[in-house]
Amino acid sequence: MSSEILDQLESKIRQAVETIQLLQLEVEELKEKNDQAQQANDALRNENEQLKVEHNNWQERLRSLLGQIDNV
């Protein structure tokens, strides 16, 4: 192999390594964003469940009050 071909090969290998490193960084960033999104999702699900319970409690109280009004 000539020196020129080896230089081209070396250059392509360096570019490939740099691309791989950049992609690895991007993957790490995406993993972090995914984790943050998952945490936000979990928090919203918990809040939703709490609101459902609160909503049901209010409905029960309202039914009770309406029942008392009907009895009057």
UniProtKB/Swiss-Prot annotation:
Which source organism?
Actinobacillus succinogenes (strain ATCC 55618 / DSM 22257 / CCUG 43843 / 130Z)
Q: Name one GO cellular component term.
A: cytoplasm
Q: What is this protein called?
A: Cell division protein ZapB
Coiled-coil stretches: 1-72
Instruction: Please give the Pfam families that the UniProt record associates with this protein.
Output: ZapB
Q: Which InterPro entries does UniProt cross-reference here?
A: Cell_div_ZapB (IPR009252)
Q: Does the keyword Transport apply?
A: no
Q: Which keywords accompany this UniProt record?
A: Cell cycle, Cell division, Coiled coil, Cytoplasm, Septation
What Gene3D superfamilies does UniProt report for this protein, alphabetically? 1.20.5.340
Tell me the compartments it is located in: Cytoplasm
Please explain the role this protein plays, according to its UniProt record. Non-essential, abundant cell division factor that is required for proper Z-ring formation. It is recruited early to the divisome by direct interaction with FtsZ, stimulating Z-ring assembly and thereby promoting cell division earlier in the cell cycle. Its recruitment to the Z-ring requires functional FtsA or ZipA.
| The organism's place on the tree of life at top rank | Bacteria
Q: Name one GO biological process term.
A: FtsZ-dependent cytokinesis
Per the record, the similarity remark reads:
Belongs to the ZapB family.
Per the record's keyword annotation, is Transferase included, yes or no?
A: no
Q: Where does this protein chiefly localize?
A: cytoplasm
Q: What binding partners and quaternary form does the record give?
A: Homodimer. The ends of the coiled-coil dimer bind to each other, forming polymers. Interacts with FtsZ.
